[in-house]
Amino acid sequence: AQTQMAGWVQGNPNLARGEAKVILNEVNSANPSRLKGYVEVAGKKADVVIANPSGIQCDGCGVINAGRTTLTTGKAEVENGELKGYRVKGGKVTVGQKGMDNSQSDYTDIIAEKAEIKGGVWSKKGIKVTTGKNNVDRTNDSVVYVGDKNTDNTDRTSDTQGENQSYSVDVSQLGGMYSEKIHLVDNGQGLGVRNAGHIGASAGDVKIDSQGRIVNSGTISATHQADLNAEKVIENKGKIETKQGNAALRSQTRVEQHGSIVSRQGGVLLQTKDKVTQT
């Protein structure tokens, strides 16, 4: 097969019955995996999975010619030689300032207890980040929480050191996500989602579902809909914009709207069980 990185490479004789559909790279180590370059699938597209329960640090990494690229701190669940999903008990996936270039992968999944995005993440058709202690299926569609319940139902994101809070999904000022559609899921103990960078869906929706709060001081832009749902407070100090669909912010407590929400061809919905504060 012809490759971008290594030119012509010989086929694997152990795969005489056909190309691999899923390539699972499972690391059992006390240390996180550090990815600083590219991985390429030679031949027909395949799904690429890198799994390390101790964490994954990507800084200038990327995957070429993958249908789906998954970085996870979960343990791979394999039945009869078939990958079924991942069981996440902890661990963090960190993307450094040099970013993650999966622009030649169709879909990118980050599945971990926490995700910290300090650089850009690119993928062709979709990016989905799922955080928390969960059982997650192989395509990141079914998510079942298996960690301790937040039985006192407190807002775990609130403390006196606002900027030093810990979030399940944290996108810094230099961080960003760029794909046709983007979905962030905080299914943890209510630590929430913070975006100080740029989350941009070039052809579809941006969806954020959080068991805690959602704090946006950056830019969230969607070609279709921007749909933010939180159990706790939604605080917008930045910019939320849609070109064709609605911008919807739904909170089970309150919405604090201090930034701008622009819906060029749709409507703006602020829905809350308590109150909406606008300044």
Model-derived segments and their meaning:
Residues 1, 110, 129, 167, ...:
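All-beta strand scaffolds that present successive hydrophobic residues in beta-strands
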Residues 1-202, 209-212, 219:
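Solvent-exposed adhesion/ligand-recognition segments of exported proteins
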Residues 63-64, 71, 98-103, 121-122, ...:
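Sequence/structural signature of small/polar-enriched beta-strand/turn repeats
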Residues 155, 240, 275-277:
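A detector of low-complexity, intrinsically disordered, Ser/Thr/Gly/Pro/Ala-rich segments
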